[in-house]
């Protein structure tokens, strides 16, 4: 997916780039696989903001994606590669031989007309989903389950891929895109290949308005606030933080502080992430 750069005809266009969408083969989504998507604007069920800087943006429908890949042994043909406004990856529309239609994440190299399948008997081919037990060492995989039958939850964004490094007992060792090395139950499903749309990271929005189209509102610096609103706030003119380490809006240490608190699964992490 090449990236198109604009000529600097205005301040907003000067550093702007967009995807060319050359891989998209179908504009209108499959209506049977759409669901309404209500805007939350970062609020929880009590109406309180739990995620800041969210709101507005273009109206969307949710595309129902098959993360479980549980149609075992039934081949499907790739009917189209589509755009999904809810994720960075492209999605592929599958037509199964029994008549059912489903969306999956479109891996790199998957084209219209290709055949994909799920299950232990599937070939080691891009787009096929198999248990980690059946996948050879060194293979790149994505859409990886953490619990058998719950559906893939890891390695789903554009250009992401994990590598199967080892198998020992009931666990497989994977190197994640972040550099983390962790163990996963060997019967969990994973899809062969790397997620497509590699050039997503090279797209530059260029102006604040494109952020607003995506539903992202402005982020105000703490130093620009009053002292009652942020630990960095206050002072006459531009003032230093006045503390040894930066703090969050709620007084917690910020920037480089570990935020992971799940000791139950620490035993599955062999090496911490590098970035």
Curated annotation (Swiss-Prot):
This is Large ribosomal subunit protein uL2. Part of the 50S ribosomal subunit. Forms a bridge to the 30S subunit in the 70S ribosome. Transmembrane segments: none annotated. GO terms for cellular component: large ribosomal subunit. Belongs to the universal ribosomal protein uL2 family. Residues 249-262 have a biased composition (Basic residues). One of the primary rRNA binding proteins. Required for association of the 30S and 50S subunits to form the 70S ribosome, for tRNA binding and peptide bond formation. It has been suggested to have peptidyltransferase activity; this is somewhat controversial. Makes several contacts with the 16S rRNA in the 70S ribosome. Residues 227-239 have a biased composition (Basic and acidic residues). Keywords: Ribonucleoprotein, Ribosomal protein, RNA-binding, rRNA-binding. InterPro entries: NA-bd_OB-fold, Rib_uL2_dom2, Ribosomal_uL2, Ribosomal_uL2_bac/org-type, Ribosomal_uL2_C, Ribosomal_uL2_CS, Ribosomal_uL2_dom3, Ribosomal_uL2_RNA-bd_dom. It comes from Roseiflexus castenholzii (strain DSM 13941 / HLO8). GO terms for molecular function: rRNA binding; structural constituent of ribosome; transferase activity. GO terms for biological process: cytoplasmic translation. SMART domains: Ribosomal_L2 (SM01383), Ribosomal_L2_C (SM01382). It comes from the Bacteria. Residues 219-263 are annotated as: Disordered.
């Amino acid at each position: 997916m090449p990236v198109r750069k604009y000529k600097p005809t205005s301040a907003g266009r000067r550093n702007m780039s967009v995807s060319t969408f050359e891989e998209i083969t179908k504009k209108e989504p499959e209506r049977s696989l759409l669901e309404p998507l209500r805007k939350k604007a970062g609020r929880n069920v009590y109406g309180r903001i739990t995620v800041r800087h969210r709101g507005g943006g273009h109206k969307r429908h949710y595309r129902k994606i098959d993360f479980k890949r549980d149609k075992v042994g039934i081949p499907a043909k790739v009917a189209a590669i589509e755009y999904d406004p809810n994720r960075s990856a492209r999605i592929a529309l599958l037509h199964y031989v029994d008549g059912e239609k489903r969306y999956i994440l479109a891996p790199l190299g998957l084209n219209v007309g290709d055949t994909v399948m799920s299950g232990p008997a599937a070939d080691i081919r891009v787009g096929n989903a198999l248990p980690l037990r059946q996948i050879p060492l060194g293979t790149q995989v994505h859409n990886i389950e953490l619990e058998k039958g719950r559906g893939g939850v890891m390695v789903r964004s554009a250009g992401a891929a994990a590598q199967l490094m080892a198998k020992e007992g009931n666990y497989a060792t994977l190197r994640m895109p972040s550099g983390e090395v962790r163990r996963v139950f060997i019967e969990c499903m994973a899809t062969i290949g790397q997620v497509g749309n590699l050039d997503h990271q090279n797209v530059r929005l260029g102006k604040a308005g494109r952020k607003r189209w995506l539903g992202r509102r402005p982020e105000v610096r703490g130093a620009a606030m009053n002292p009652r609103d942020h630990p960095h706030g206050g002072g006459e003119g531009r003032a230093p933080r006045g503390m040894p380490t930066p703090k969050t809006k709620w007084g917690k240490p910020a920037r480089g502080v570990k935020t992971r608190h799940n000791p139950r699964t620490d035993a599955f992490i062999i090496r911490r992430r590098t970035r």
